[in-house]
Amino acid sequence: MGITLPSHDRLPRAPCTPTSSARTMPETPHPRTILRGHKAQVHALAFVGNNDRLASGDAEGYVALWDLTIMRPTAVWQPHDNAILGIQGWGADRIITHGRDHKLAVWKLATSDEANLSKKLPLDDTSEPRPQPWLLHLIDVNTMNFCAFAACVPTDPPPAGDDPELLLAVPNTLASESIDIYHLPTQTRRHTVKSPGQNGMVMALALVPQGDSLTLLAGYENGVTTAMHLSAASGTWNTTYRTQPHSQPVLSLDVSPDGLSFVTSSADAVVARHPVPPPAGMEVLEQPLKVVNTKHSGQQSLRFRDDGRVFATGGWDAMVRVYSGKTMKEVAVLKWHEVGCYAVAFASALKAPQAAGGVEERDGTVVRRAGEVSVRERRIAHAEAAHWLAAGSKDGKISLWDIF
């Protein structure tokens, strides 16, 4: 029997309490909400908009956009015929999806467009069509690697009024150990970067703008992690860092918000921090900054929060682990799912919530008009101010935590 109404569980909030070393979760934290809507594994998560929307992608190619002010879906469609590998917001009204059907798509989806889209979740047994948003770009890519795309804004943005630009890194179409870098909106391939050595397939990627140039970070099947820098003068790619802290394939990597280091996780139990070498470096660095044996193998979807204070991983053991961004010490273990967690995402901790209604400005000072803030406005303000951490699991459910 199909599910006709999307359900979510409102669970008691566990307040965050400080300790002498870091503000950590209490001993038995609980998720604020469980979002139930996918019948297949949740493989990708991303907060979009002003923290009030969460995009989730599953193993059957469905994407659900959740309105976190009411904890309900506001748009559901199937952008791909196979599993979703990655999702990312781009600007105020664009969402990028990357599927195992060898396609990377960019969709225009403003809040005003949501009314025209289906709200029937993948769990719903329905014959109603699920219209797709407006498709802006579609690129044929290689997805044999299970490696999600990476993206960054070019260091030389276009003039005001022109279409926004973006660089995308994906595994090479023919050689799964090499990397292609595409440009949007032209959809042209700008670079093909070869692997420095026999490292097997590319498993995880990141792009880091540095001055007027670019650094490409990659994790490989054999546990090797590299940094390769594009010379602005010659247009060639040079390896600036190479190390092998992992004995198993790299599963994920993410760059610290200051752009000075990045952290990798693997099928082994190691979490390692690496330098992002400066562009002017003359030698190939080989030593990671820190290597931690966490004793917990299979941590993936490693993500920093944008204030750099913490990063999190999803574990094959169903645990979500939160680490200090500074010391790399484990500061919280979030347990709710019964099976492996494949995706995690942080909402922005730096975005200022938009002003709620019922306010006015007097002599340069914002003053609230008593009694004029609606329930919806309070919900919006809470959704935008919450320090959300979302975790997606093999069970198709998404746990939503409000952490320090």
From Swiss-Prot:
Keywords: Chromatin regulator, Nucleus, Repeat, WD repeat. It is found in: Nucleus. WD repeats lie at residues 37-76, 79-117, 197-238, 245-286, 294-333, 370-404. Pfam families: WD40 (PF00400). Gene3D superfamilies: YVTN repeat-like/Quinoprotein amine dehydrogenase. InterPro entries: WD40/YVTN_repeat-like_dom_sf, WD40_repeat_CS, WD40_repeat_dom_sf, WD40_rpt. It comes from the Eukaryota. Residues 1-31 are annotated as: Disordered. Signal peptide: none annotated. One of its GO terms (cellular component) is nucleus. GO terms for biological process: chromatin organization. Component of the ASTRA complex involved in chromatin remodeling. Component of the ASTRA chromatin remodeling machinery complex. Belongs to the WD repeat ASA1 family. This is ASTRA-associated protein 1. It comes from Verticillium alfalfae (strain VaMs.102 / ATCC MYA-4576 / FGSC 10136) (Verticillium wilt of alfalfa).
